[in-house]
């Protein structure tokens, strides 16, 4: 078996998918990104171009065009047939991810190819068991913004082969220049199991009228040396994503600290998703 991962596929070209595609292409990999329709594909391509041009202008990249030349954005999952690893980066919806993994299992031809998920909360076992290659299914969870943050969580299920984990680790650490940690296959993994209760506590404090959003956030920026406060961070993550992760954690552990506050549910229902919608706990310019 050739253990190297050279041909990478990414499903989804939103904020996370585009970031994953960018860092893989910047590392020299051949990357194919799949979006659900041409409009989304064009938007994803534009997102990649904007990010890479900005990196070039800031002197962090020699040639944006060279990196863009290693990325194809398409609309057919079948184009992923020859990939060494495919990273799923679609919406945080268990049913949608399960269906996608069923399709990828039929499409990706190499029996050694890794099928990876960028899920931030869904147990990997639920995705692995719908494939005929559960030993090659792994969580590979990047953090937003992907080109900036170094951490990647590697999440093997009980059925993931040790060799699969090590191949992914070699790529993440060696090729991408990031730092991989390994964590158990439980909802939220390491970072979100700690982060989400912190954010939810801040939302409850704001909801109760205990303090303003600005004062809550400034308390942690100026008093705890955090780069940003919990409510601004929730806006950056996306309130819909924060809600989905909280629901997944609460469903698995039934602990009150993971229960989404009513205000968070109302904001998501109203379409107030944070930065990506222009309004969350703060208002943002388009």
Model-derived regions: residue spans:
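Rossmann-fold dinucleotide-binding core
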Residues: 114-184, 192-193
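NAD(P)-dependent Rossmann-like dehydrogenase/reductase catalytic/cofactor-binding core
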Residues: 2-4, 29, 163-166, 173-184, ...
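Amphipathic alpha-helical segments at domain termini/boundaries
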Residues: 8, 26, 65-85, 167-177, ...
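Rossmann-like NAD(P)-binding element
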Residues: 39-40, 54-114, 122
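NAD(P)+-binding Rossmann beta1-loop-alpha1 motif at the extreme N-terminus of oxidoreductases
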Residues: 1-51
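Hydrophobic/aromatic beta-strand patches that form the interior of the parallel beta-sheet core
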Residues: 32, 72, 87, 138-140, ...
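Rossmann-like dinucleotide-binding cores of NAD(P)H-dependent redox enzymes
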Residues: 33-65, 156-164, 180, 187-194
């Amino acid at each position: 078996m050739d253990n190297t991962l050279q041909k990478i596929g990414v499903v989804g070209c939103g904020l996370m998918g585009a970031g994953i595609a960018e860092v893989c292409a910047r590392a020299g990999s051949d990357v194919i990104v799949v979006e659900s329709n041409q409009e989304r594909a064009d938007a994803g391509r534009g997102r990649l171009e904007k990010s890479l041009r900005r990196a070039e202008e800031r002197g962090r990249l020699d040639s944006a065009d060279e990196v863009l030349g290693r990325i194809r954005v398409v609309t057919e999952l079948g184009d992923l047939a020859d990939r060494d690893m495919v990273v799923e980066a679609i919406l945080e919806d268990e049913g949608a991810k399960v269906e996608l993994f069923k399709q990828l299992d039929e499409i990706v031809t190499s029996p050694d190819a890794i099928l990876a998920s960028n899920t931030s909360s869904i147990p990997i076992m639920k995705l692995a068991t719908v494939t005929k290659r559960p030993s090659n299914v792994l969580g590979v969870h990047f953090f937003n913004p992907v080109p900036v943050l170094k951490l990647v969580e590697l999440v093997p299920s009980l059925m993931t082969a040790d060799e699969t984990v090590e191949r992914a680790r070699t790529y993440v650490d060696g090729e991408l220049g990031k730092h991989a940690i390994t964590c158990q296959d439980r909802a939220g993994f390491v970072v979100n199991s700690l982060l989400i209760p912190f954010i939810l506590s801040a939302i409850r404090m704001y909801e109760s009228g205990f303090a303003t959003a600005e004062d809550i956030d400034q308390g942690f920026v100026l008093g705890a040396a955090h780069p940003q406060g919990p409510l601004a961070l929730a806006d950056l993550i996306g309130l819909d994503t924060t809600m989905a992760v909280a629901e997944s954690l609460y469903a698995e552990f039934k602990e009150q600290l993971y229960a989404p506050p009513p205000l968070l549910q109302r904001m998501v229902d109203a379409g107030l998703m944070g930065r990506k919608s222009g309004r969350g706990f703060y208002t943002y310019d388009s």
